[in-house]
Amino acid sequence: GISIDRVFNEQLKGVSREDSLQLLLKYGKKEGTFSSEEFAQLAQRKNDYYLEMIQAITPEDVYPGILSLLTELREANIKIALASASKNGPFLLEKMQLTPLFDAIANPADVQAGKPAPDIFILAAKEIDLTPAECLGIEDAKAGIQAILASGAQPVGVGRKEELGEGLPIVPETSALTFDYLKKVWLDHEG
């Protein structure tokens, strides 16, 4: 096995299954030790563990403040798209009963490159008939923040500036993401 710490684990957030496995193998100095077939089997096994873990997810697992934020955005006729690197994103939304609150769910299988490339955010904006420059992107991972910036959208980070980067609006946790806060970020961005 490969032991990882919290700091390294942050680098795995927001990247595709294959990219995260590549990063893990590189970190554990096992890069290049597996054939393509073995790598695919490892990626599948990693995903199987993850799928087993998320079977128990319920609406009670929605992060604090997210349901009220999504509801407020819907009531204000703000379009909402999911730009997750995870192919399991739609399943998670279903388990948490959030799917009806989204106008679009960008499929990571439909993009050339995963985060930190901007492809998924460009696709998400397109699916709600907007340009990235007309969008805010909310992310809890550095790779996601980089992807939002590269797309031309305005990022909002959830977490710590030490992990996400300097010079962008950051809230410490999802409960601080309110419609009023996002309006302020947008107005400051446009300002």
Question: What is each stretch, according to the model?
Answer:
Residues 1-68, 72-76:
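N-terminal helical cap/lid subdomain that shapes the substrate entry/recognition surface
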Residues 67-72, 86-191:
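Asp-based, Mg2+/Mn2+-dependent phosphohydrolase catalytic module
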